Amino acid sequence: MNRKFLPKRARLLNLNEFIFVFQKPERVKTTGITLFSRSNRLGYPRIGLAISKKYVKYAHERNRIKRHIRETFRTCQHNLLAKDFVLTIRSKEIIYYKNKTLIQELEKLWYHHLC
């Protein structure tokens, strides 16, 4: 059985890595989601999530959104440039998105960073 997962090396894990992205980021915005990115020298893309309770109150909703973000990143990470990405939520309306709509919005964001 071939397991597909997001390896630990593909995630931003500490504060300094997040700060690095926020210092001089490229930004791409959709309705409610902002993607910050910055080139890295590792040769592969990495992802970090910053989803606050201010915009997504309930944990089960934050978890659903994070699950979809990680899954869309995992499926297209091999086509992305070597960058560090941080996704933030900037609208309370995102909790009303159906899963399909959320995935379409995320795929639009990743499309901007293809090779």
Curated annotation (Swiss-Prot):
GO cellular component: ribonuclease P complex
Keywords associated with the record: Endonuclease, Hydrolase, Nuclease, RNA-binding, tRNA processing
Gene: rnpA
Listed EC numbers: 3.1.26.5
Family per record: Belongs to the RnpA family.
Assembly and binders: Consists of a catalytic RNA component (M1 or rnpB) and a protein subunit.
Name of one Pfam family that matches: Ribonuclease_P
MF terms (GO), sorted A to Z: 3'-tRNA processing endoribonuclease activity; ribonuclease P activity; tRNA binding
Protein name: Ribonuclease P protein component
Annotated GO biological process: tRNA 5'-leader removal
Main function: RNaseP catalyzes the removal of the 5'-leader sequence from pre-tRNA to produce the mature 5'-terminus. It can also cleave other RNA substrates such as 4.5S RNA. The protein component plays an auxiliary but essential role in vivo by binding to the 5'-leader sequence and broadening the substrate specificity of the ribozyme.
Species of provenance: Blochmanniella pennsylvanica (strain BPEN)
Listed NCBIfam families: rnpA (TIGR00188)
InterPro entries to which the protein is assigned, alphabetical: Ribosomal_Su5_D2-typ_SF, Ribsml_uS5_D2-typ_fold_subgr, RNase_P, RNase_P_CS
Catalysed reaction equations from the record: Endonucleolytic cleavage of RNA, removing 5'-extranucleotides from tRNA precursor
